[in-house]
Amino acid sequence: MLRPFLLLFIFGFILNLNSSVVEEFPYWILLEKGRQLIYSKEGFVKSNLTIAMNYLQEALLRKGIYPEANYYLSVAYSMIGNVVLEKLHLQKALENKDYLLDKFFEKNILFSLAKIAELEDHHVDMIDYLNEILSKFSDSDDYYNYHYVVQKYEDTTGNKFNMSFYLHSYLKQVRGTSGLDFTFNLYRFNNYNIIDAHQLLAKVYFKIGAYELAITHGLVAAVGILTRMYDYVSYYEPLYEFKNLRSFARKINEYTDIKNSFESTDFWEIVYNIAYATYSYDDGKYKSRAVDTWKLIVDLAPKFSPYILKSRIQIKDFLLGKSVH
């Protein structure tokens, strides 16, 4: 009888102590404490999450309008699977975006709303959120910043979302090189903060059958990941020059940290989806390019990648004259 009572007393004491401590902190410290508990190295601990939410709600109560607190509350609610409150706090954060101290924070809010729209199959909302990210957090030079900084395509003037030159280079038949090789030899994309937006746009455009846009955004995402890996390799070997994806993959594998970083990305999933969209694009005129891209995955992806088997199946179906699925 004494032990349950003692545990209850201790728990109550901790709660009272916590509430008294909360009262002493200014709102910005409450926000930071809540954020630290959410992203704690201990991982998901329900008690920590409850305390974090208390901190954040108190910070919001004190400041009144606090989009950062709304965002972190949305993260907390996503961790317990409460999509309704997650979305509500994200919408509130977006509504009060003008009060954000760090304007780039808006990108996280928009991307989270796009992910919820994906779950709800609201494709138009998803595309709108992602395009707003591109509109606010990228500029035209992000897409041209290699050989074609000066010599831009005429039809892209004043329209940074026209990235058709990525598609043209990928589909171009050049002897002795793959589509991805040729594209990466022409372009770099180092606005790493929006690679995920391009990746998600590629995914939704493929889902609705907009294959040209699916390929294009997928290529930007793939080139962005390769650009980052190229930067890492160049740190160790300043004179290194990219020749083709096969030799570059071998070079990446020479450095454990770069290899681990590369394998933590969704690169091979992106490339697989590029190939899939290519197969269906323009009434199947580029099936051979799709198959070549799947062959790259079979040859270069790490052995644990599920996209090796998927690519083999697609290649086999193509050779047998079956429809790709």
What residue spans do the PLM features occupy?
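Canonical tetratricopeptide repeat
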Residues: 72, 105-108, 112, 145-149, ...
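N-terminal leader/linker segments that initiate helical-solenoid repeat arrays
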Residues: 17-55, 61-62, 68
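Start-of-helix register in tetratricopeptide repeats
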Residues: 28, 68, 101, 108, ...
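Terminal, low-structured helical/coil segments at or just beyond the last alpha-helical repeat
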Residues: 248, 255-280, 284-325
